[in-house]
Amino acid sequence: MYKTIREKTKAVYVGNVQIGGNNKVVIQSMTTTKTHDVEKTVAQVKELVREGCELVRIAVLDDEDAAAFGEVVKNSPCPIIADIHFNPLYAIKAIESGAAKVRLNPGNIKDEEQLRKIIDLANKKNIPIRVGVNSGSLPMDLMKSHGVTADAMMIAVKRYINLFESNGFNNIVVSLKATNVLLAIEAYKKAAMEFNYPLHIGITEAGSLFNGTIKSAAGLGVLLHEGIGNTIRISLTGDPLSEVKVCKKLLNSLGLYDNLVDIISCPTCGRLNFDLNPVVKEIEKFTRKMNFPLKVAILGCAVNGPGEAKEADIGIAGGNGTGIIFANGKAIKSVPEDQLVDELKKLISIKYKEYLDSKKDK
C-alpha cells in the first residue's frame, strides 16, 4: 500500500489539538460570519466541526469583534484561533478572552514593543502564535528589495521568529501563503528546510469552489506528498463547509485521512453499458454524512469493472440491464439495474453499522 511519509517537526498544542510531531494533518477553516454576531458565528463553527473541521479561525476586526470573542470561545466545540491584522491590541484582548492560538501577519503588525506584550501574554497562557506571511501583504521594504518572491517571504518570517526567539518564545506555527501555486510551493519548501516549526499550509485566495479546489490540490498535493505540512486550510470563495470537504478528500487521496467513504466510478466512456451517473449521485448523497473508511466502486463495463470492483470494499460492475455486486473482493450476487442503488445502500448500511459497533466496543 502506498503511504505518504511525513516530515517530523516540533509539536505545539492548540487547545486540545496537537499540530506537528507525529500527529496527523489537522483540518481547519475560517468563519465567514461577522464575529460580533455570536449566535451566527457559533452556529457556523458547530457546522464546521460536524463536517470534520478540528480548528476554526475567526476574524477580530474591530472593538465589537474583540468584545464578542470570549463568548464565541465559551460556546465553541473546538479550539478557536484569533485572526489579527493591523491592531496588536486585539491580539491581547483575544488571548485574554481564551484564544487557543493567534495568527499575526508580519506585513501589518510591526511595533516591536506591542509584539513583546503579545509574546509575554502568549507565554503566560501557553498558547502558540502563527507567523502568517502572505504574498499579498509583505512588508514594503521587502517588496522594494526582493519583490513578491519566496526569499522575501522567508525574510519576513525570519524577522518575526528572531524577535520571538530572542524573547524566549518558540511556541510557533509558520505559514507562507501565496495565490501563485508555484510561489507557495517554493516558499514552503524553503521553510521546511529552514525551520523545525509546524507548517500551516494553504494557497491563499485560491478562488471559487472549482478553481480554488484545482489550485489548492495542485499546490498542497505536492507539498503533502513530500511530507510538508502539519495543518491545512483550503481557502475557497463561499461556504466554508466546502473547504473542509475538499480538505478531507485531498488528504484521503494521499492516504492521510481515512474517515471518509471513497467512491470511485467510471468516466462514462463509449464502453458504458448502463446509466451510471444517477447511481453515483445517489450513493454520494447517501454516504455524505457517513464518516468512516469505506471504498465503493461503481463501474459500468466489462473492461475494468470486475477488477476494480474486486479491489473495493463494496463494488458493482454493471451492464446490459444487470449488475454484479462485489463485497470484500468476491462477487456475491447479480441484480437488475433498477435494484442496484437499493442493494448498494443496504450493503453500505451494514458496513456502517459494523463500523459504529466496533467503535462502541472500544
Swiss-Prot record:
Q: Which residues form the signal peptide?
A: none
Q: Would the keyword Nucleus be found if you checked this record's keyword annotation?
A: no
Name the SUPFAM superfamilies for this protein. Answer: Dihydropteroate synthetase-like, Nitrite and sulphite reductase 4Fe-4S domain-like
Query: Which Pfam family would be a valid example here?
Result: GcpE
Cofactor details (free text): Binds 1 [4Fe-4S] cluster.
The annotated pathway is: Isoprenoid biosynthesis; isopentenyl diphosphate biosynthesis via DXP pathway; isopentenyl diphosphate from 1-deoxy-D-xylulose 5-phosphate: step 5/6
Q: Where does [4Fe-4S] cluster bind?
A: C266, C269, C301, E308
What EC number(s) are associated with this protein in UniProt?
Answer: 1.17.7.3
Name the keywords, alphabetized.
Answer: 4Fe-4S, Iron, Iron-sulfur, Isoprene biosynthesis, Metal-binding, Oxidoreductase
Q: What reaction(s) does this enzyme catalyze?
A: (2E)-4-hydroxy-3-methylbut-2-enyl diphosphate + oxidized [flavodoxin] + H2O + 2 H(+) = 2-C-methyl-D-erythritol 2,4-cyclic diphosphate + reduced [flavodoxin]
Q: Which family does it belong to?
A: Belongs to the IspG family.
- Protein name listed in UniProt: 4-hydroxy-3-methylbut-2-en-1-yl diphosphate synthase (flavodoxin)
Q: Which organism is it from?
A: Malacoplasma penetrans (strain HF-2)
